[in-house]
C-alpha cells in the first residue's frame, strides 16, 4: 500500500477542498484515464483496491499509472474517549482529490479492455468518475 516514507508532521489539519484541481486534468502518460467528477479523500486502501481490480481485469497486460498519492494523515480518537485531551492518533493516509483530477491512466490494451478496467476501478472509489481519452494536441507539422 502507498504510504509516505517520512513526514515532517504526523498530524495534519483536515483542510477543505474548494473548486477544481489546478493540474493533472488531462491524460498525460497513457491512452485512457479515470477522472474524478466530485471531490473527496481517497484512502491508500481504496487506491490499492482500484489498482488490483484494473490489473486483474487486464491480466497483467498493459501499463497502469497511479497519479494520486496518499500524503495526508487522518486521525481519530478512540471510542468512548471524552472531548479534549489533544488530537487523536494517526489512523491512516488519504489523497485529497479535487474534481476534474485524473487519478489513473491506462495504456497498452484495447479500448474496450481499458474502459472496462477503469469502470471496475471506479466502483472501488468514493467519487463519481468519468473515463476520458488522451487528446492529441495539434502541434507543428513538417509538411510542405
Swiss-Prot record:
A single GO molecular function term of this UniProt record: structural constituent of ribosome
Gene that produces this protein: rplP
Keyword Ion transport carried by entry: no
GO biological process: translation
Pfam families: Ribosomal_L16 (PF00252)
Keyword line: Ribonucleoprotein, Ribosomal protein, RNA-binding, rRNA-binding, tRNA-binding
Protein function: Binds 23S rRNA and is also seen to make contacts with the A and possibly P site tRNAs.
Protein name: Large ribosomal subunit protein uL16
Organism of provenance: Pediococcus pentosaceus (strain ATCC 25745 / CCUG 21536 / LMG 10740 / 183-1w)
Source taxon at top rank: Bacteria
Subunit structure: Part of the 50S ribosomal subunit.
Family of this protein: Belongs to the universal ribosomal protein uL16 family.
Cellular component, GO, one term: cytosolic large ribosomal subunit
Amino acid at each position: 500500500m502507498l504510504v509516505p516514507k517520512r513526514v515532517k508532521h504526523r498530524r495534519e489539519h483536515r483542510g477543505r477542498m474548494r473548486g477544481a484541481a489546478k493540474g493533472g486534468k488531462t491524460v498525460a502518460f497513457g491512452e485512457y484515464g479515470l477522472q474524478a467528477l466530485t471531490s473527496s479523500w481517497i484512502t491508500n486502501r481504496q487506491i490499492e483496491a482500484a489498482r488490483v481490480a484494473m490489473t486483474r481485469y487486464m491480466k497483467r497486460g498493459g501499463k497502469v499509472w497511479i497519479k494520486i498519492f496518499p500524503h495526508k494523515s487522518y486521525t481519530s480518537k478512540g471510542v468512548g474517549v471524552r472531548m479534549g485531551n489533544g488530537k487523536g492518533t494517526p489512523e491512516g493516509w488519504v489523497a485529497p482529490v479535487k474534481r476534474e483530477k485524473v487519478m489513473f491512466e491506462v495504456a497498452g490494451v484495447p479500448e474496450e479492455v481499458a474502459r472496462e478496467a477503469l469502470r471496475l476501478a471506479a466502483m472501488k472509489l468514493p467519487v463519481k468518475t468519468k473515463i476520458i481519452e488522451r487528446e492529441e494536441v495539434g502541434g507543428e507539422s513538417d509538411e510542405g
